[in-house]
C-alpha cells in the first residue's frame, strides 16, 4: 500500500511539474520579451538544425516603414487594433463558409501568430492549438499592441533563412526596413502565408495581383499616434 501511495504521490508531482512547465514557462518568456529583443524562436532553431542559414537583424518598430506595418495588418489581420487576440467576426465567417461547403480555413490573428512563432513548434494538432490559445491570452494581457507588432515583424519567417523585416527588406529589395516603398511593403506582406514558396523580390502573377489589392487597402489602416494602434 505504501508503495502504491508513493507512486501516486510521485505521479502527482510529475503532473504538477508538467503543468507548471506548460503554463508557467510562457508567462516567464512573455515577461522577459516584453522589453528584451527575441534572440531566436523554435522555428529558427529547427531550421538551423536542418542546416539552413539564419539572416536576422532586430530593429525597433520606428525603424520599420509605416507602409509595412499597414500592409501586414491589411493582409494578415485587418481588425488587429480592435480585437483582444481572437477575431470572433473572422472566426464566425470561416465557420459559416465551411458550413456552405468551403474548406475550413484558419482565422489566425497577428497576436496568435506571434504567440505561436515565439513559443511553439509548427503543426496543427489540438495540443499545440490549445497552447497557442492560452499563450495568446497571456500575450494580449501582458503586451501592448505596439509590442506585439514589433516582435512579430522581427521574428516572422520571410523566406528560407530570412527572419524579420530588416533582413527581408535587404534580401529581397536591397534596402532597409525603414526605406521600403508601399509596393515593396505590400509584396512582403502578401508572401507571409507561404514565404518559402512565394518570393517578394521575384513575385509571380498571383503575388503581384494580391499585392496590388493589399496596397489599395493600406490607406484605411490607422496606426494611431504611437505607430501601432495607440
From Swiss-Prot:
GO cellular component: peptidoglycan-based cell wall; plasma membrane
Signal peptide range: none
Regions crossing the membrane: 13-33
EC number per UniProt: 2.4.99.28
Residues forming coiled coils: none
NCBIfam families named among the record's database cross-references: mono_pep_trsgly
Summary of the function given for this chain in its UniProt record: Peptidoglycan polymerase that catalyzes glycan chain elongation from lipid-linked precursors.
Designated name of the protein: Biosynthetic peptidoglycan transglycosylase
Source species of the chain: Rhodospirillum rubrum (strain ATCC 11170 / ATH 1.1.1 / DSM 467 / LMG 4362 / NCIMB 8255 / S1)
Amino acid at each position: 500500500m505504501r508503495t502504491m501511495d508513493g507512486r501516486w504521490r510521485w505521479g502527482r508531482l510529475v503532473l504538477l511539474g508538467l503543468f507548471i512547465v506548460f503554463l508557467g514557462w510562457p508567462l516567464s518568456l512573455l515577461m522577459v520579451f516584453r522589453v528584451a529583443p527575441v534572440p531566436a524562436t523554435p522555428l529558427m532553431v529547427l531550421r538551423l538544425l536542418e542546416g539552413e542559414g539564419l539572416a536576422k537583424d532586430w530593429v525597433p518598430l520606428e525603424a520599420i516603414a509605416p507602409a509595412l506595418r499597414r500592409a501586414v495588418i491589411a493582409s494578415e489581420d485587418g481588425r488587429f487594433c480592435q480585437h483582444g487576440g481572437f477575431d470572433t467576426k473572422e472566426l464566425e465567417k470561416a465557420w459559416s463558409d465551411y458550413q456552405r461547403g468551403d474548406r475550413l480555413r484558419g482565422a489566425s490573428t497577428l497576436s496568435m501568430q506571434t504567440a505561436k512563432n515565439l513559443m511553439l513548434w509548427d503543426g496543427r494538432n489540438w495540443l499545440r492549438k490549445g497552447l497557442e490559445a492560452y499563450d495568446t491570452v497571456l500575450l494580449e494581457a501582458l503586451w501592448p499592441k505596439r509590442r506585439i507588432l514589433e516582435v512579430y515583424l522581427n521574428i516572422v519567417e520571410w523566406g528560407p533563412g530570412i527572419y524579420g523585416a530588416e533582413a527581408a527588406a535587404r534580401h529581397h529589395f536591397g534596402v532597409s526596413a525603414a526605406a521600403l516603398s508601399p509596393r515593396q511593403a505590400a509584396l512582403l506582406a502578401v508572401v507571409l502565408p507561404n514565404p518559402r514558396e512565394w518570393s517578394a523580390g521575384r513575385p509571380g502573377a498571383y503575388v503581384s495581383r494580391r499585392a496590388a489589392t493589399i496596397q489599395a487597402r493600406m490607406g484605411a489602416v490607422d496606426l494611431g499616434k504611437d505607430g501601432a494602434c495607440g
